[in-house]
């Protein structure tokens, strides 16, 4: 199964941002790894944990964790 949009990211400071599609993720996060950014929590529209990896504006992984 694939994650369902919108994707929500809760950052270490408590701020939550929502992304409507893959392009929105790429253009607004640019460089992000949910495995190494341990203070962040990434969830899909159904509240499921998501593994998200972006490197230099390239979406490397978007899957259920």
PLM region spans:
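Short, flexible N-terminal segments of the mature chain
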Residues: 15-41
């Amino acid at each position: 199964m694939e994650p369902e949009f919108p994707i929500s990211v809760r950052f270490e400071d408590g701020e939550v941002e929502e992304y409507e599609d893959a392009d929105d993720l790429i253009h607004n996060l640019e460089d992000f790894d949910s495995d190494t950014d341990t203070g962040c929590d990434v969830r899909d529209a159904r509240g499921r944990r998501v593994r998200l990896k972006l490197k230099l504006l390239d979406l490397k992984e978007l899957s259920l964790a």
